[in-house]
Structure formats: structure tokens, C-alpha cells
Amino acid sequence: MAVKRDYYEVLGVQRNASQDEIKKAFRRLARQYHPDVNKAPDAEAKFKEINEAYEVLSDPEKRSMYDRFGHAGPTAAPGFDPFSSADPFSSIFETFFGGTMRGSQRGPQRGADLRYTLSISFEEAVFGVEKTIEFRRLETCPACRGSGAEPGTEPVRCPKCGGLGEIRQRAPLFNMVTVTTCDMCRGEGTVIAIPCRECRGEGRVRQTRKITVRVPPGVDNSSQIRISGEGDAGPRGGPYGNLYVVIDVQPHPYFIREGNDIILELPLNVAQAALGVEVEVPTIDGTEHLRIPPGVQSGAVFRIRGKGVPFLRSSGRGDQIVVVRVVIPTNLTDHQRRLFEELARSLEKEPIGGQRDEGFFGRIKNALGL
């Protein structure tokens, strides 16, 4: 069994210290070692030791007996109970630091956040759009204003916990206190005597809400837009949570987004690729004139600047990347076959091979600067 330290040593005062000195020393140490403030493993044990020393030295009768008989003296003093039902942690903070140190700090609780998936087109994601959405949420009951009590009545103090919102129990053999949330009032400290007929005592009712959401230009798929105060109402009149609108961008028939660039695959036949061609290329803004030089290879990349997606947090736009795809015919007419055979004979003396092709995806990466 551990030997108890001298109470004067515990508080760090002389044996002839005045009551004022003892009180100041205790207050300083209580602030330092209270378990709600100090998270050190031994803080609770030190705090109990400090509390026990102060309980003896602050009482003239107990102090006198302690000075005469040591630790055996105070335990024999009338009315002294080291396992008192009072909670030393809360009583000390109530006495010296104001208010109470309760395990469940009651007050308005914020409502839950909500999520809403908003589907928009590729063009709407590029240029931005305003959409009206409709969703269900919990709102503060207009009849009882969130109290849960029938209008004209008020919640009453919980008879089980006396309004504390928690139940405290002291172990019979140890100076330890267990704190549990009151199961009658669920930690609120009050109960509804006459429930509101509108919300059945819940303080909230589920309602349909309709709002307009502004989607900024350049928003990407799976982006979230936070709308403050549009979530569920908090219980008992607590503040509303937030609404998070998750953007779902629908795929485009032929545009593909890569960051702030838009990729378009441009099919050309063999003759167009060999001889070159001028084409009208679709962009997100309309059509653009593009000249394809003779001898272009499949996978060649052309850039149309400023025709991509707007930057979300700065000015300017990305580019449109046009990727050439040479289409080889599969069903030739007799005339076309003869022409290709003649072309093949004329190309027999041309060298095969040459510079190594970097491939389709390599060209895309180079065009995007990756």
C-alpha cells in the first residue's frame, strides 16, 4: 500500500501557512491538475491527492487533528468522509472557477448536413447554370419553435437527473465517480410534459424545400457546392446544418474533358490525310476553321487555344485539343480497289519504317504538356 504524502508537501506550503495561502496554493494546483484540463495519465491521481489535502487543511478542526496525529487524525474527525457523494471535480470548479464542469455540456446542437446530387449537361458545366432543386429536410417546428412542448407549456426539469443531463455514481470502495448520460432526458436536462401536437414532441418537422443553386462556370464532375444553413434544423431550436450539392456532369457525345482542356477526335479518310484538308471543327462555342496539312498521321494533335473549360478560380480558359484519327476503309468498291492497288505499286520503292511512332496517347500527353 502506497504511503500518503504529507498534506503540506502536497500543496507546497509551510506548516504555519495561513488559510489564504492554503487556498491560493490549492486553487493554483487544482487548475493545473484537473482532469478536464490536464490530460496527463497521472493528473487524476494528483488531483485527488490535492483535493484530499485541501479538504483537511482548509478545515481548522481537521487540520488541528492532522497536525497532532498525522493521517490517522482527520479520518476520526466527526463528519469527515473521504468517500463523500459529492463530486470533487465539479464542486471545485463550481467554487473557484465559476459555473459547473458537467460531462455533457448542453446547448443548441447543430443540425445534420445533407447531400443532393445535381445532374447537369456538359455545356452547363462549362458555362455555368442556375438550377432550382427540391429536397426534404427537417425544419424547426413552427408551432413550438423547436422546444417540443405544446404551445403555452414549457419543458420541465428532468426528475431523474434533476436537470443535470447526467447520472453520477460513486463507487463504494474507491473515491471514483462514474458519469453516464441520463436515459430519461437523453442528456438534455429537461423532459416534455405535454408534447407539441404538430411535431409530436420532436421539435422538428420534415418539410419540402425549394431553392436555386448557382453552378459556377468550369465546375467539374463530383465537385461539391456548400450552401450554408440549408441542411436539417438542429434539435430543440438548434442551428441548421449545411447542404452539399454534388455535381454529376453528363457525358458529351464527342467532347471529353481533361482538366480544363476539351479533347475532340477528328476522323479523316486516307485521301484527306494524305492530301490535306480544311475542315470545320465543332467546339463548345460553335465551329472553328482548321487546316490539316498533307501527310498528317493518325494521332496527330492540333490545339485551338481558348476554346476549353473556364478556370474555376481564375480568369481564362483551357484549350481544345483536336486528335486526328485516320479511318481505313473496310468495304472497297472495285474502282477503289484498283486505285489502291495502283497506289500500292507506286509506293513499293518507298522505305518502310523510319522514325518510331510515339503513339496516340503519347501525342495526347505532349499536347496537354504532361
UniProtKB/Swiss-Prot annotation:
CXXCXGXG motif repeats lie at residues 141-148, 158-165, 182-189, 196-203. It comes from the Bacteria. Residues 6-70 form the J domain. It is found in: Cytoplasm. Binds 2 Zn(2+) ions per monomer. Gene3D superfamilies: DnaJ domain, Heat shock protein DnaJ, cysteine-rich domain, Urease metallochaperone UreE, N-terminal domain. A zinc finger (CR-type) spans 128-208. One of its GO terms (cellular component) is cytoplasm. GO terms for molecular function: ATP binding; heat shock protein binding; unfolded protein binding; zinc ion binding. Zn(2+) 1 binds at C141, C144, C196, C199. Its cofactor is Zn(2+). Disulfide bonds: none annotated. Keywords: Chaperone, Cytoplasm, DNA replication, Metal-binding, Repeat, Stress response, Zinc, Zinc-finger. Its main location: cytoplasm. GO terms for biological process: chaperone cofactor-dependent protein refolding; DNA replication; protein refolding; response to heat. Zn(2+) 2 binds at C158, C161, C182, C185. Belongs to the DnaJ family. NCBIfam families: DnaJ_bact, PRK10767.1. Homodimer. The J domain is necessary and sufficient to stimulate DnaK ATPase activity. Zinc center 1 plays an important role in the autonomous, DnaK-independent chaperone activity of DnaJ. Zinc center 2 is essential for interaction with DnaK and for DnaJ activity. HAMAP family: DnaJ. Participates actively in the response to hyperosmotic and heat shock by preventing the aggregation of stress-denatured proteins and by disaggregating proteins, also in an autonomous, DnaK-independent fashion. Unfolded proteins bind initially to DnaJ; upon interaction with the DnaJ-bound protein, DnaK hydrolyzes its bound ATP, resulting in the formation of a stable complex. GrpE releases ADP from DnaK; ATP binding to DnaK triggers the release of the substrate protein, thus completing the reaction cycle. This is Chaperone protein DnaJ. The lineage of its organism: Bacteria, Bacillati, Chloroflexota, Chloroflexia, Chloroflexales.
